[in-house]
A protein has these predicted regions:
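Flexible coil segments in periplasmic/lumen-exposed cytochrome c-class electron-transfer proteins
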Residues: 261-291, 336-373
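Short cysteine/histidine-rich zinc-coordinating motifs and their immediately flanking basic loops
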Residues: 242-247, 304-310
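Detector for the c-type heme attachment site
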Residues: 232-236, 297-303, 329, 351-355
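N-terminal secretory/membrane targeting signals
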Residues: 1-22
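Sequence/structural segment immediately N-terminal to covalent heme-attachment motifs in c-type
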Residues: 278-304, 312-313, 318-330
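Alpha-helical transmembrane segments
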Residues: 43-68
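Non-transmembrane, membrane-proximal soluble domains of secreted or membrane proteins
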Residues: 22-45, 65-279, 283
Length: 373
């Protein structure tokens, strides 16, 4: 009895705590696009129709059970089928289904048909990151899980507990997708390897990313803010480490962001033609390694025996640089290609791998990567 009282008290305390239900909800989000709000309205309409049907059906059933029970001396009626009743209980559900199907069909058409978009963004799923391309603006970048979340994966239990209490744990990225408010955006969604799924609940968008195919979706965000999503298709060991973060900003801020990204691109192209020092390459390479390579080869370069080779003492990192450059550019069995990275990033990460972890490989310059492409 004492154990039962203790357990009951603990449950009551948990239910009564504010933190237990601070962000807990059973309902879907309304979202910040007209489309997501239409979907929410459909969801709620169907819910209340089901509630009304449940009240009528179960109300009639329980009333019949109680009011016509045998203990009250009620005798069951003896009658055959009623054509009128059969028409009623067939016709009413048909009318309900038609009433629900009309707005649902309209919303489905709105989801699938986009007459004109103000801008286009190509979304490419890659194990285990997202690549975003703005073809009209000439902008392209890869979005990885934020380093703050990566660091805690192998942290102490106390450090993990501290981060688990943060709402952005495993939901933050190093580079956000940026979109202007009140702008119709067409998303072209594909994959470089396996099937992924690009899902942003606030947009009402959830679309498969299939290798070799391009699926499209669209959204017109109406509110400025930061919105999060996730890969919604089991895609390998780090499936849970593929968050999506979208910043919806004013049109003026978006124009400034585009200008800054285009300036970064010019600077990046210029950096690929210059000679870098080993220290500069190693410093930059460590950041690239932690974002793109540490998930498999581990942050300390130890790898996972029998699965992912170690960087420490590797024949690749201590061997000819040309072979390693080709491996990073084109991939290998069990390792994806990293052509989406800039020449400077590839040169930096290769140099980091070849000059860290006790290795004594040669330094690689961005021009070496440019020549190998």
């Amino acid at each position: 009895m004492k154990l039962l009282l203790t357990f009951t008290g603990a449950i009551a305390a948990l239910i009564g705590s504010k933190s237990a239900f601070a962000e807990y909800t059973l309902n879907m989000t309304k979202g910040i696009t007209d489309l997501s709000q239409d979907i929410y309205w459909l969801h709620m309409m169907a819910f209340w129709v089901c509630v009304a049907i449940g009240v009528v059906v179960f109300g009639a059933m329980f009333y019949s059970i109680v009011a016509h029970r045998k203990s009250k001396g009620v005798k069951a009626a003896n009658f055959h089928e009623s054509t009128t009743v059969e028409f009623i209980w067939t016709g009413i559900p048909i009318l309900i289904l038609i009433a629900m199907a009309i707005p649902a069909s309209k919303t489905l058409i709105d989801i699938e048909v986009l007459e004109k978009a103000d801008m286009t963004v190509k979304v490419t799923g890659i194990q285990w990151k997202w690549q975003y391309d703005y073809p009209e603006e000439g902008i392209s970048f890869v979005s990885n899980l934020a380093q703050s979340s990566r660091d805690v994966i192998k942290a102490s239990p106390e450090e993990r507990e501290a981060v688990h209490n943060e709402s952005t744990y495993l939901r933050s990225v190093d580079k956000h997708l940026v979109l202007p408010v009140d702008t119709t955006v067409r998303f072209l969604i594909t994959s470089n390897d396996v099937i992924h799924n690009w899902w942003v609940p606030a947009f009402g968008v959830k679309q498969d990313a299939n290798p070799g195919f391009i699926n499209d979706a669209w959204a017109k965000p109406n509110e400025i803010g930061t919105y999060r999503g996730q890969c919604a298709e089991l895609c390998g060991k780090d499936h849970g480490f593929m968050p999506i973060v979208v910043d919806v900003v004013s049109k003026a801020d978006y124009a400034a962001w585009v200008e800054s990204k285009q300036a970064e691109k010019v600077a990046e192209l210029a950096s690929a033609t210059q000679e870098w020092t080993e220290a500069e390459l190693v410093a930059r390479g460590e950041e690239v390694y932690n974002a793109n390579c540490s998930g498999c080869h581990q942050k300390d370069g130890s790898g996972i025996p029998g699965v992912f080779p170690a960087m420490i003492g590797s024949e690749v990192t201590n061997g000819p640089a040309d072979y390693q450059i080709g491996m990073v550019l084109n991939g290998l069995r069990g390792m994806p290609a990293f052509k989406m990275l800039s020449d400077t990033d590839i040169a930096s990460v290769i140099t980091y791998e070849r000059r860290s972890f006790g290795n004594n490989g040669s330094v690689v310059q961005p021009s070496d990567v440019t020549s190998a492409r």
